[in-house]
Structures are given as structure tokens and as C-alpha cells.
UniProtKB/Swiss-Prot annotation:
<keyword id="KW-0689">Ribosomal protein</keyword>
<protein>
    <recommendedName>
        <fullName>Small ribosomal subunit protein uS17A</fullName>
    </recommendedName>
</protein>
<keyword id="KW-0694">RNA-binding</keyword>
<dbReference type="GO" id="GO:0019843">
    <property type="term" value="F:rRNA binding"/>
</dbReference>
<dbReference type="InterPro" id="IPR028333">
    <property type="entry name" value="Ribosomal_uS17_arc/euk"/>
</dbReference>
<dbReference type="GO" id="GO:0005634">
    <property type="term" value="C:nucleus"/>
</dbReference>
<dbReference type="GO" id="GO:0042254">
    <property type="term" value="P:ribosome biogenesis"/>
</dbReference>
<dbReference type="InterPro" id="IPR019979">
    <property type="entry name" value="Ribosomal_uS17_CS"/>
</dbReference>
<dbReference type="GO" id="GO:0005829">
    <property type="term" value="C:cytosol"/>
</dbReference>
<dbReference type="GO" id="GO:0022627">
    <property type="term" value="C:cytosolic small ribosomal subunit"/>
</dbReference>
<dbReference type="Pfam" id="PF16205">
    <property type="entry name" value="Ribosomal_S17_N"/>
</dbReference>
<comment type="similarity">
    <text>Belongs to the universal ribosomal protein uS17 family.</text>
</comment>
<dbReference type="InterPro" id="IPR000266">
    <property type="entry name" value="Ribosomal_uS17"/>
</dbReference>
<keyword id="KW-0687">Ribonucleoprotein</keyword>
<comment type="subunit">
    <text>Component of the small ribosomal subunit (SSU). Mature yeast ribosomes consist of a small (40S) and a large (60S) subunit. The 40S small subunit contains 1 molecule of ribosomal RNA (18S rRNA) and at least 33 different proteins. The large 60S subunit contains 3 rRNA molecules (25S, 5.8S and 5S rRNA) and at least 46 different proteins.</text>
</comment>
<keyword id="KW-0539">Nucleus</keyword>
<dbReference type="GO" id="GO:0003735">
    <property type="term" value="F:structural constituent of ribosome"/>
</dbReference>
Length: 152
């Protein structure tokens, strides 16, 4: 994935807005929160060093609205993934269902290591960019092996 391990990779100095940093205070102070709704804060968010203002665990974003699940299709963007949500649509004329899908862009925190094929749970938040309105809350790693039964 395209997430960096270096904290200071931007032009401006990256710091958490909640923590006052000076020479007298020891390093290692970190602010994090519980997003609620039964989702655990990952250990990387608690003990990590990254700074991400759009992260639901250490940033200024609150999760409200819909909670969705989908499969990761693309991880090519910086801190953003594309997930695919498949569903069945009923056709009354033929009394049958057809498979359809929607692609959804979601912000991924550096606390997660995501690869294509992983199943992620995302929560709705305020608009983070033109297309991104969701944030990754949980990741279930994709297991390799024989072809497995999916949702549909």
C-alpha cells in the first residue's frame, strides 16, 4: 500500500493539534479516541507515531451515519482505497435477481495495512474530499487458498 512509514513527509511540520510539544515535556505523548459503535482502536493508533488529521482514531473526524462492508479492489491512491460492494437486484418481469455492484472510495488510516482482496468495514463521516465520504474502521485479512464462497 502507498502509506508511508515516515511521519514528517509533508512540507509542513506534522503534529497532533491536541498535544502541546516543547522541550520540557517528554516525547511520546499521544492523543487518541474510541470511535464507539463497538470498534476497537488499533494498537498502531495508540502506540504509533503517524499523524493523520483524517484518521477516525487520532484525527478530527467523527463516524456517524452508515456502516458498510466491502472488498478492497484498489490501493493505488495515497491513503485512499476503492472497495466493491456487491448486491442482488430483483427484476420483476423475469422474477429473478441480477448481480450488481457499486465502487466506494474510503480513507484508510496508516494504522491499517491493507491489501487487495481484504474485507473492510467502513463508517460514514463528513466529506473528506470530492469522492471520499467513508473511513476504514476494521480490516479482515484475505486468506489465500482455493476459491472460497463469497457473499454472492
Amino acid at each position: 500500500m502507498a502509506t508511508e512509514l515516515v511521519v514528517q513527509s509533508e512540507r509542513a511540520f506534522q503534529k497532533q493539534p491536541h498535544i502541546f510539544q516543547n522541550a520540557k515535556k517528554g516525547a511520546g505523548r499521544r492523543w487518541y479516541k474510541d470511535v464507539g459503535l463497538g470498534f476497537k482502536t488499533p494498537a498502531e493508533a495508540i502506540y504509533g507515531e503517524y499523524v493523520d488529521k483524517k484518521c477516525p482514531f487520532v484525527g478530527q473526524v467523527s463516524i456517524r451515519g452508515r456502516i458498510l462492508t466491502g472488498t478492497v479492489v484498489s490501493t493505488k491512491m495515497h491513503r485512499t482505497i476503492i472497495i466493491r460492494r456487491e448486491y442482488l437486484h430483483f427484476i420483476p418481469k423475469y422474477n429473478r435477481y441480477e448481480k450488481r455492484h457499486k465502487n466506494l472510495a474510503a480513507h484508510v488510516s496508516p494504522a491499517f495495512r491493507i491489501n487487495e482482496g481484504d474485507v473492510v468495514t467502513v463508517g460514514q463521516c463528513r466529506p473528506l474530499s470530492k469522492t471520499v465520504r467513508f473511513n476504514v474502521l476494521r480490516v479482515v485479512k484475505h486468506t489465500e487458498g482455493p476459491k472460497q464462497f463469497g457473499k454472492f
